[in-house]
Structures are given as C-alpha cells and as structure tokens.
C-alpha cells in the first residue's frame, strides 16, 4: 500500500532545514516550489521524525484548510481557545506544555495546530482588530517557551491566502514586520512560511522591508535518480520507469498515482497517456475561455508557450500579464531567485507542446 503522498528520500532538504532549526533564529525562511512537490510532507516529516520534542515547541498553522476572507477568519485560524484557568495553568507548567494540550496536538507529530488563548482575549482581538495586541500576545507565549529552555517554531502553510487581507493596510506587511522582530531582532522564534504560489513569492521577493532578513528555499520535484529509486521500490521495471519519467517527470503526487494504478492492475503506459489527454483537455478549456474573454492576452499566452517547444525552462526579464495568467492557472511556475519560468509539471510541458502542434495544423 502506498500513502497519498508517501515520503521518500529528501535527505538534502532534511539536512539543510534541520541545520537551520539548530541555529539561533535569525531569518524568515520562505519554502516554495511547484504545486504538489512535497513541501508540506517534507516539513511534517522533519517535525515528526527529526526534531527533539524536549527541545522544540512547534506551532503549525495550515491556512490551506480554511476559507479566509477577512481579518477575523485569520485570527480564528491562528488561535485555539481555552478557559482562562487553563491558560494560567499553562503559564505555571510550561515544561509540560505538550502533554497538557491533548486536544490541540496531533499525537503522532506533537505539532500544535493553534496558539492557545483564553476566550475573552480572543474576543478582544476580534472586536478591536488591533494586530499589535495579537503580536504582543504571541511574543509573550514564545518568550515563555524560550524561558523554559525550549525553542519555538512557527510554521504557516499557504501564507499567500492572507496576502490581500487589509486592516489599516495589508495584514501581510504587518506580519512580515512581526516575523522580522521574532527572528532578526529578538532571535526568539524560527519562522517558516510555505507557499505553492510563486507569484506571491515573487511579490515577497521584491518587498524592500525583507531585504537581508529572509531566505528562500526551493523544494522541487524529484530528479531522475530519486524518481527511479522510488519507483524501483514499488517494483516498476526499467521500461515502466522510463514511461513514467517521460510523462510525469519527478512529480511526487503523480508517481504515487502511477504506483496505485499499477497495484490495481492497470497498464502504466495507458494510465500515463490518459493523464496527458485529461491535462491537455483542461488546458484547452482554459485557453478557449481566455480567447473568448481577451483575444490579445490569449495570443500573448500562446506566444509564451512557444518558448517551450524545444526547451523545458526559460529565463524571464519581468513578470508580464501573460506570465501572471499562466501562473495563476497553475500552468507555469516562477523560480524567483534564478529568474526561471517553467511548466508546473512534465505533464503540463507535454500538454503545451501538443496544443501548439494542433494550433499549427
């Protein structure tokens, strides 16, 4: 049996991030990559298997699971409420922090999925909409943890979901300043921000307040060597491996799907070919809709796609309107540090090429 996103051989990434977490907090880390490249799986594996629970307290806030359209939504996701008496107990017995919060923790991972807060304090945060009060409270929690000899880690998954929220300006910029305070200024708490939205990461990359205060870490799809080892582990022969690599590259989620289909007795090549037909149909539907709405942009998108007829990736000078459209539709991916534009997956690359061939004929 194979898990929906089985963890496999990320030793380079694990070693790097574990080393980062062993240092004194000094920088915000933005962990990004193509969709379904395994970012969340990697981080959870590190937390659950590589960190000493006696040394670290991890707060993992997953915004992916929530609809967030206003400040109140974000605050309610950020915090878990408890009775005041429990919070007082928490302050007294912080060393038993993890054991005292059974409802708030994934037993296997010992990850806290929200910041503990008394109900009346949460109500105050919601009514006043004062982010400074929220940040002061969070700082106090992290300071208390640090005083007890533990290192707090704050992880926010899919941070881009609050990118456009406003409270006297964009909330995201207030958060960035808070993260700088936690890391660069106070060296209090590690901050890891995960995102599959490369346009959001590009926006962050060009944000002046973060210069020299953050680092970007790319978690990409598997290379051929890792892909081959992964499929070999699941009894794929060399021909099947080459077929899967041709259609899917090293996209972890597609490799898992191929393994599951093989276990179900399906033909691997037929599954791959069907996957390409489906993805091509999806892209054509998006393009037809764009052509109806904006003929000029459609033509620029097709011209952009033509760059991939003989190349897997290209360099870009600036983020144009056609790049924005393709990235928002999860067709292309922007590697901001290297200025590289490439399809989100090998399947997208093949679909683009087949569509271009059909347009020519």
Curated annotation (Swiss-Prot):
Family annotation (SMART domains): AAA (SM00382)
List of residues binding ATP: 33-40
Domain of life: Archaea
Gene Ontology molecular function: ATP binding; ATP hydrolysis activity
SUPFAM superfamilies: P-loop containing nucleoside triphosphate hydrolases
Keyword terms: ATP-binding, Nucleotide-binding
Gene3D superfamilies in the record: P-loop containing nucleotide triphosphate hydrolases, Winged helix-like DNA-binding domain superfamily/Winged helix DNA-binding domain
Membrane spanning stretches: none
InterPro entries: AAA+_ATPase (IPR003593), ATPase_dom (IPR011579), MJ1010-like_2nd (IPR049081), P-loop_NTPase (IPR027417), WH-like_DNA-bd_sf (IPR036388)
Keyword Mitochondrion: no
Family: Belongs to the archaeal ATPase family.
Name of this protein: Uncharacterized ATP-binding protein MJ1659
């Amino acid at each position: 049996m194979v898990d929906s996103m089985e963890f496999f051989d990320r030793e380079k990434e694990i070693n790097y991030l574990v080393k980062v977490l062993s240092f004194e907090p000094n920088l915000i880390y933005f962990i990004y990559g193509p969709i379904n490249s395994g970012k969340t799986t990697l981080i959870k594996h590190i937390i659950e298997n590589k960190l000493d629970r006696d040394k670290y307290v991890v707060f993992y806030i997953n915004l992916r699971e929530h609809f967030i359209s206003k400040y109140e939504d974000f605050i309610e996701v950020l915090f878990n409420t408890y009775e005041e008496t429990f919070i007082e107990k928490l302050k007294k017995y912080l060393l038993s922090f993890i054991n005292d919060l059974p409802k708030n923790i994934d037993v296997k991972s010992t990850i806290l999925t929200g910041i503990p807060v008394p109900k009346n304090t949460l109500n105050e945060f919601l009514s006043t909409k004062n982010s400074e009060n929220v940040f002061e409270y969070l700082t106090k929690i992290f300071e208390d943890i640090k005083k007890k000899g533990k290192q707090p880690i704050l992880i926010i998954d899919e941070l881009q979901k609050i990118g456009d929220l406003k409270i006297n300006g964009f909330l995201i910029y207030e958060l960035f300043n808070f993260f700088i305070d936690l890391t660069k200024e106070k060296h209090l708490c590690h901050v890891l921000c995960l995102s599959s939205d490369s346009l959001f990461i590009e926006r962050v990359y060009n944000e002046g307040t973060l210069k020299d205060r953050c680092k970007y870490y790319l978690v990409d799809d598997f290379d051929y060597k890792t892909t081959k080892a992964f499929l070999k582990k699941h009894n794929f022969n060399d021909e099947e491996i080459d077929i899967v690599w041709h259609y899917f590259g090293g996209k972890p989620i597609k490799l898992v799907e191929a393994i599951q289909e093989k276990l179900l007795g399906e033909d691997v090549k037929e599954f791959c070919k069907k996957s390409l037909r489906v993805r091509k149909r999806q892209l054509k539907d998006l393009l037809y809709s764009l052509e109806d709405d904006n003929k000029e942009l459609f033509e620029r998108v097709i011209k952009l796609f033509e760059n991939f007829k003989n190349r897997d990736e290209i360099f870009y000078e600036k983020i144009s309107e056609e790049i924005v459209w393709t990235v928002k539709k999860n067709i292309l991916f922007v590697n901001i540090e290297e200025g590289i534009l490439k399809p989100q997956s090998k399947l997208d690359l093949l679909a683009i090429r087949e569509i271009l061939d059909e347009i020519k004929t």
